[in-house]
């Protein structure tokens, strides 16, 4: 009987340890999510994800085109009107319209196509990678940039822990 009691104690302790480990992982994930990435240059807005060969995510008009996601890591809305986005360093190819806001701890997706009319960034991204995507302030000073990488059709690129864009 002692053996059965000891086995029950061991099983009970293993369950308790598993619950504690899961709770510790959850708390760690929450804390890390709310921290700013080390590579963000001290700005609360940065390029967080890029799609260079979109075959899976149509925009509200049903168009499949490249897109760039801007993330705001701060607890306040960020007015991005007058800022620029480009696929070339120093060239502000797309100017965010006045009144454009990236919500607090939120995202803004910019659709990119030189062929579409309306509110599109007027450039496409190379599918093969090696292109620098830049977010610039109203004076065209670079706040964030990232070099695209080659990836499969329909696969997005996300920022790795070192800030590089890597296949998701």
Language-model features, listed with the residues they occupy:
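Activation on beta-sandwich/Ig-like modules and their edge loops
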Residues: 2-168
